[in-house]
């Protein structure tokens, strides 16, 4: 999946793909690891743009039925498999807001 680069569309693309995925099949999702803050801003402003694809990957890592690994190649390629999550991510909810350290993981503001 390498489409619109925006959270809502990427999430929709992955969920739709899961419906038709063969048993044991994999979904690959490109642009999962922005290196700079400017690479993940929506809407696109300038330069290299990965969008906020990474947010979908973080969210799906909290799902018990999706096993995900992220390869640190070509701006991040996430491998998604419908399977028991071998590394379930638990996000602590602090006063109704997601922990900003989790949301900004891997990003550096310029």
Label the predicted regions.
Residues 1:
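Redox-cofactor binding/interface segments in oxidoreductases and associated redox assembly factors
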Residues 4-110:
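A short alpha-helical cap/connector motif
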């Amino acid at each position: 999946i390498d489409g619109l680069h925006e959270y809502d569309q990427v999430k929709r693309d992955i969920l739709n793909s899961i419906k038709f995925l063969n048993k044991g099949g994999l979904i690959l999702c490109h642009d999962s690891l922005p290196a700079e803050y400017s690479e993940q801003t929506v809407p696109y402003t300038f330069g290299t743009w990965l969008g906020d694809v990474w947010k979908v990957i973080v969210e799906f890592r909290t799902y018990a039925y999706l096993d995900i690994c992220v390869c640190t190649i070509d701006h991040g390629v996430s491998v998604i498999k419908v399977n028991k999550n071998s590394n379930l991510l638990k996000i602590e909810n602090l006063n109704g807001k997601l922990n900003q350290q989790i949301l900004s993981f891997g990003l550096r503001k310029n």
